Amino acid sequence: KLMTMIAALEDQVIDTLQMIDTENGELDFYGFKVRDSRKGGYGKINAMDIFRLSSNTGMVKIITDAYEGKSEKFVNRLYNMGVNNPIDLGIKGEPNPKIPHPSENDWNGLSLPWMSYGYGILLTPLQILSFYNGIANNGEMVKPTFLESTSKLGSTNFYEFKKEIINPSICSKKTLSIVQKMLLDV
């Protein structure tokens, strides 16, 4: 949901105080339900609370209202964050991220609403962690580094690693400041 909120803020289709009706906590798309974890939903809440409460219906409404018929703009915004690029950690079996695009054959009417709250995409925990670390690192997403061993305390041996930047700027400084504050309330 963090990536979704960043996309919406970057494209200025939402502001944090804008009120969204999460209905009764349930939305129907082509016979499939999107539900909030809270039975009965949250009613009308602002975008900041949608993020804080992790409202699936709220995120879906923000994204479908803003990007219906413009799905490519939303997906391209995610791609611009760098989340569709492999990290290449050298770990055997590490999958490439999969973020569907409207130009692909498997794109359908459920793709946009599902993606808005993290369904229908494939990211490993390390890919997600790298993204969150990028937010904590003032927008700079860095490739994780793994140590094979460490030296004993007091030893003169130490390791120095070159920082490998995946994306120097996930989003604008304005959006970064907003989402950093939002994350403090989660």
Feature locations, PLM:
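Beta-lactam-recognizing serine transpeptidase/beta-lactamase-like catalytic domain environment
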Residues: 3-186
